[in-house]
Amino acid sequence: EFQMPFGFKEVEGIHSRTNFDLSQHEKYSGKNIKYFDPELGESYVPYVIETSIGVDRMFLSVLCSSYEDQQLEGGERRVVLHLPAALAPVKVAVMPLVRKDGLPEKAREILDGLRLHFNTQIDEKDSIGKRYRRQDAIGTPYCVTVDHQTLEDNTVTLRHRDTMEQHRVPIAEILPTVSKEVSMASLLQKIAE
């Protein structure tokens, strides 16, 4: 069971059927379906353990545990979908600070370099703050902001969804940095720790 916002719900059912089902099948079919265990030197009808798991319920439990409606300073609200980065549908959003001065073109150039490696989108509409909020709400783990400094020194601002921390990184470091964080291997390693 999993604690959903609307109460505990079953995600997986595990049922110990003992040997009832196979015994009934043996009884009505007239076939011997006993298993001979050479170690014990005896025959018996095996026990059956039946499991059933719904992908839809499992996915719903991930969504419910990832959703957060934060109250920020100044009364603002921030909806964040803290999906594990490996499960996020969009890994990176590339955002030109403004829609002029060559920034959209540079953003598309960066997008083209990333899109072969993982699902990436460009977001140009509204203020940069609204774009960050929009990407937070859909679970995008990283945002890349292209600004006027990008045109001067080939660096961008890389923003992390969960911490909202921002760092200047060279364009060449976006792919290795993000790839490491959004890989399934990274997720499995975090689970194992």
Question: Which residues fall in each region the model found?
Answer:
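NTP/phosphate- and nucleic-acid-binding module
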Residues: 1-193
